[in-house]
């Protein structure tokens, strides 16, 4: 059978580990979006870097194939609402920042919809299996939510959180109403 292949890393670490400005900005972003460690942030930064790298490559490509690839890139970014312009250009892709991707994580959307009081509580609800997307339980806080799935985020029906009078749920709803 052979050994299974070794999977490569899905992120790149910073070139220089001890730059104070970068550390401070990473800390602020981690607190704002409830990230547990820097690796989660680096994964999203690498994903953004790959989108931008592809856009830079496509700017110089004037063939019909380059046009098709640009349309495919726009479709992917629109599907996840990372790119919201109606007539996107490659310059729009180059102007994306890390927060545009972090806003599409399931953890952030659960918090923004008011299903949890904090981003960290949203993460806990997801990891513990209280959140469903399109009726399927999702336990990955970094799951990127597409536009089609945006309205289908809810509590799992057989979860204790689905009860209207659960203490944590009523606290989140009452704080949202104030």
From Swiss-Prot:
Record InterPro entries: Ribosomal_uS4, Ribosomal_uS4_arc, Ribosomal_uS4_CS, Ribosomal_uS4_euk/arc, Ribosomal_uS4_N, S4_RNA-bd, S4_RNA-bd_sf
Any one of the GO CC terms: small ribosomal subunit
Domain of life per record: Archaea
GO-annotated molecular function: rRNA binding; structural constituent of ribosome
Region (Disordered) residue spans: 158-178
Keywords: Ribonucleoprotein, Ribosomal protein, RNA-binding, rRNA-binding
Pfam family, one: S4
Keyword hit for rRNA-binding: yes
Gene3D superfamilies reported in the protein's UniProt record: RNA-binding S4 domain (3.10.290.10)
Domain S4 RNA-binding: 104-166
Flavoprotein in keyword set: no
A Gene Ontology BP annotation from the UniProt entry: ribosomal small subunit biogenesis
Subunit structure as annotated in this protein's UniProt entry: Part of the 30S ribosomal subunit. Contacts protein S5. The interaction surface between S4 and S5 is involved in control of translational fidelity.
Its job: One of the primary rRNA binding proteins, it binds directly to 16S rRNA where it nucleates assembly of the body of the 30S subunit. With S5 and S12 plays an important role in translational accuracy.
Protein name, as recorded: Small ribosomal subunit protein uS4
